[in-house]
């Protein structure tokens, strides 16, 4: 028998809190929200109407107990529309890049499957010993010449691990590899507003955001960057295995993350989640300065690389914060191309006076 009561609003997303006990918390400005729980991807198991009695501030929360929901999936409904949770750990119907499925339901697993890390831990390579290699997961191995089995996926990067090691790099920096909305599939999109970062059009005439600097569900690895999301509800294994295999080669994993109007709470929760759940070694953040400083001074993240374009606040007691020297990127490209009058700028950006 299922028992339902008010939950913990501070514990956002869907969390298992005990044997057959689960907490759900969703922030929304509506007067009521409906929690939908599915047995698999199609069969609706139960509906929970969350009215004002389940609300604390703008957060609806409930605790469900009495039945095993470890393999169940969920989403929310507002004004007759099914919407995914911003804290969703996985997202269904996103397994094909730039394809919007008819009658798609964007559901998330409540509990992820266990993963054997075999004692893996973040590597904590000092900055002075680091060489970053920035890649787009899909673009890096999608070519016919990549010589990997699963092209454009996290598994493809695993197959390139020996090559990356031979290059002498110490870290791969992944351009957005969480569930960004490249095609405008999520219902919270404003139909009159185009996502930022557009560079070409999709097949159906929709704007396509290839790079990922746009709206996103930041807690879920990008399903279309895996080889198994079309048939597995929990496809997170592939990202975790990529991190584990790269760590075995002495290569760190840095996640590039773009935030716009997300709250400092969500941003911090997100970084913590990726560090604890996926063992990533650092993040390159784009976001509000106040949120960046909150992340940088978070004791949970005190040994996690936190990188951005500038810092204006207190430094951590461990040397884990860094400025991302974007100016060097443009200068060195022009210098290597042989553009005129680049030597002085190149010398500046390779000296201690860079960006001072």
Regions found by a protein language model. Give the residues of each.
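Structural beta-strand segments of beta-rich domains
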Residues: 20-24
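Active-site neighborhood of glycoside hydrolase catalytic domains
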Residues: 248-251, 258-315
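Conserved, mostly hydrophobic/aromatic
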Residues: 135, 164, 174, 274
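A short, hydrophobic C-terminal helix/tail in secreted or cell-surface proteins
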Residues: 352-356
């Amino acid at each position: 028998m299922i028992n339902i009561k008010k939950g913990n609003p501070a514990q956002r997303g869907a969390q298992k809190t005990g044997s057959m006990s689960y907490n759900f918390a969703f922030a929304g400005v509506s007067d009521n929200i409906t929690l939908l729980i599915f047995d698999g991807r199609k069969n609706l198991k139960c509906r929970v109407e969350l009215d004002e009695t389940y609300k604390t501030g703008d957060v609806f929360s409930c605790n469900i107990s009495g039945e095993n929901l470890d393999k169940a999936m969920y989403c929310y409904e507002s004004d007759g529309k099914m919407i995914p949770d911003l804290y969703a750990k996985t997202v269904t119907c996103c397994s094909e890049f730039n394809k919007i499925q008819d009658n798609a339901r964007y559901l998330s697993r409540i509990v992820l499957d266990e993963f054997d890390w075999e004692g893996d831990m973040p590597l904590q390579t000092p900055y002075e010993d680091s060489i970053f290699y920035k890649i787009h997961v899909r673009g890096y191995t999608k070519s016919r010449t990549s010589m990997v089995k699963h092209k454009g996926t996290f598994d493809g990067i695993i197959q390139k691990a020996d090559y990356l090691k031979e290059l002498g790099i110490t870290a791969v920096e992944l351009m957005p590899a969480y569930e960004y909305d490249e095609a405008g599939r999520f219902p919270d999109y404003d139909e009159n507003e185009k996502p930022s970062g557009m560079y070409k059009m999709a097949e159906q005439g929709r704007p396509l955001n290839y790079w990922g600097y746009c709206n996103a569900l930041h807690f879920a690895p990008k399903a279309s960057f895996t080889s198994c999301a079309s048939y597995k509800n929990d496809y997170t294994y592939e990202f975790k295995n990529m991190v584990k295999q790269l760590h075995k080669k002495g290569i760190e994993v840095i996640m590039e993350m773009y935030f716009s109007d997300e709250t400092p709470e969500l941003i911090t929760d997100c970084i913590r989640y990726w560090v604890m759940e996926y063992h990533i070694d650092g993040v390159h953040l784009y976001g509000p300065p106040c949120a960046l400083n909150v992340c940088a001074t978070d004791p949970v993240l005190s040994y996690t690389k936190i990188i951005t374009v500038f810092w204006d606040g207190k430094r951590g007691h461990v040397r884990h914060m860094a400025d991302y020297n974007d100016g060097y990127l443009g200068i060195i490209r022009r210098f290597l191309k042989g553009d005129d009058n680049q030597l002085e700028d190149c010398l500046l950006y390779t000296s201690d006076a860079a960006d001072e």
